[in-house]
């Protein structure tokens, strides 16, 4: 179970399930298709702060403090085991947004559905949306504000990017 990606990934899974039900698929077909689809939804994140992750034991407090002092943003993904995998560290928002677009390319995104969820950072979410649409012709991008547990971990300035790869 990829618990880290539950919020954004579940949105696409619910939509996909609704589509399958509307098509009149049988229960066994739906189960098989949902298991297949689950493998093709992914989550990337950009965090401006690691403080709450440190408080909950996901990163060491010294690492969180050092990142804050140096203005480092962490770009990562949800692993298959539900852990946070750090892909890279960048300085500044623009570098983080560029890196997200590069990671999308590397992880098989072509032009499917992509959802950007921001935590008090609508300007960065809009910039990322425009960057994605410029690179991936026909991309279906929507934006919302983080809520609940996602906003706690993303913290102010954080972005979560849920997307379907080319095989979805």
Please give the residue ranges for each predicted region:
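Single conserved hydrophobic/aromatic residue that forms the stacking wall/gate
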Residues: 1-12
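Mixed-charge interfacial surface used for oligomerization/domain docking
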Residues: 10-168
């Amino acid at each position: 179970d990829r618990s880290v990606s539950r919020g954004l990934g579940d949105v696409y899974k619910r939509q996909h399930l609704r589509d399958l039900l509307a098509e009149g698929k049988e229960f066994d077909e739906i189960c098989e298709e949902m298991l297949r689809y689950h493998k093709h939804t992914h989550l990337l994140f950009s965090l401006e702060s690691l403080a709450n992750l440190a408080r909950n034991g996901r990163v060491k407090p010294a690492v969180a403090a050092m990142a804050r002092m140096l203005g480092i943003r962490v770009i990562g993904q949800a692993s298959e085991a539900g852990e946070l995998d750090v892909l890279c560290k960048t300085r500044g928002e623009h570098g983080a947004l560029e890196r997200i677009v590069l990671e999308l390319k590397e992880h098989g995104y072509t032009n499917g559905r992509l959802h950007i969820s921001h935590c008090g950072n609508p300007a960065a979410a809009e910039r990322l949306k425009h960057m994605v649409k410029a690179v991936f012709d026909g991309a279906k991008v929507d934006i919302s504000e983080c809520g609940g547990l996602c906003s706690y971990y993303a913290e102010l300035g954080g972005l979560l990017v849920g997307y379907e790869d080319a095989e979805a």
